[in-house]
Amino acid sequence: GVDKDLRDLADEFASHGYIAAAPDLFWRTIPGPLTRADGELTSKRSQPRAEKIKTGEADLTDTLAELRKLADFNGRAAVMGFCYSGPYSIIGPKRLGYAAGISCHGSRMQDYIGELEGVTAPVCIIWGDDDNQAPPEVLDAYRAVANRMSNVELHIFPGIKHAYMMPDAGAAYDVKTRQFSMARTLAILNDLRGGGERLRKAS
């Protein structure tokens, strides 16, 4: 849900001069933020997972439509996904009209690796190798894709756990990996804002 960590991230992007939107993908079931102690509710509202991810595509399409109404929007948006929403980093550029995708500690990404076929926009995927939602075989599969697709960049950090981006994640939170992830995201956004070299190659 859209908790303080996500609102703070949106504010951080805004402080760099970017338009930021954080849609609540769970508004149809159990809306709003949940605490990390609400494990049962968190699981319940995201199931059945494939169906919920598919339904959320409409929310991302609607979000992009709203952005296009803004005078300051240049027509290029990136989708950034964490945990449950990691797959949108692929789905967004694949078929929803987004110009780039970034996933930080995405979950169940093995179900969406085939969606990368035909994607030419920049996709950046970042994990820790101690992420319980990204087993070694998933990391290896994405390594293979990144090795053959120049628009896909993959970063895997040793000892980093799931939810490393989120200060509320307790011991899993990692400042340095978060800083790296933000730096890479801002670099991609800068390309989208100015039509940088990577964007021209992907067009």
For the regions a protein language model found, what residue spans apply to each?
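N-terminal cap/leader regions of alpha/beta-hydrolase-fold enzymes
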Residues: G1-S203
